[in-house]
A protein has these predicted regions:
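Outer-membrane beta-barrel proteins
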Residues: 1-195
Length: 195
């Protein structure tokens, strides 16, 4: 698949930009919020976010919500994005669930909705296993469907050297490039070094 022509965004993409300037409140009883803005002349983004963390039944639960209003100066390319997530930490396991939405255009010519769940498990100080599954569609294009599943392992070779191996399987159908369900897979290997 080619991202520029085959799909607009992966289901797990939250579409919340990094603000150029932001304010993060101190935590108040587990609640905090963020305000941010990026001004690029004719294009600007306004970002809001909130987070609440609590401990319950032996687990740490975090609720997250963020919005990003993108004004490009052009009615057809303005964007409105939101991301809602729940993160549950239980022992060595972390479960993340999210729903991401992105509307494009003032009259909304594209309405992407993605949902997914991911799990990570710390096996030892050197090994972490991950897996996730997500699906996405476009409320303005009923022919568009995308699923993405992946598994991975991270291995700390030595302090400062981490090897990551991931494998993804994707299935795509849209109204132009792939009118029938088409599958693809990829495996990537990365070595991260920090000093």
């Amino acid at each position: 698949f080619t991202a520029a022509t085959d799909y607009t965004a992966l289901p797990a993409d939250e579409n919340i930009s990094d603000p150029a300037i932001s304010y993060l409140s101190p935590s108040m009883g587990g609640f905090s919020f963020m305000l941010g803005r990026t001004d690029g002349g004719t294009a600007e983004n306004t970002i809001y976010g909130a987070k609440f963390t609590t401990d319950t039944a032996g687990a740490t639960v975090t609720l997250k919500y963020a919005t990003d209003e993108g004004d490009t100066g052009t009615a057809t390319t303005n964007t409105s994005a939101s991301s809602l997530g729940v993160v549950i930490g239980l022992g060595n396991a972390t479960i993340t669930m999210a729903q991401n939405e992105k509307d494009t255009g003032d009259t909304v010519t594209e309405a992407l909705v993605g949902t997914g769940v991911g799990v990570s498990y710390v096996v030892s100080d050197s090994v972490t296993l991950t897996a996730y599954s997500a699906s996405g569609d476009d409320d303005k294009d009923t022919t568009y469907e995308l699923t993405d599943t992946g598994v991975g392992i991270s291995y700390t070779v030595t302090p400062g050297m981490v090897l990551h191996v991931t494998h993804n399987d994707q299935d795509l159908k849209n109204g132009s490039t792939y009118t029938t369900s088409t599958s693809a897979s990829r495996t990537s290997v990365n070595l991260n070094l920090t000093f």
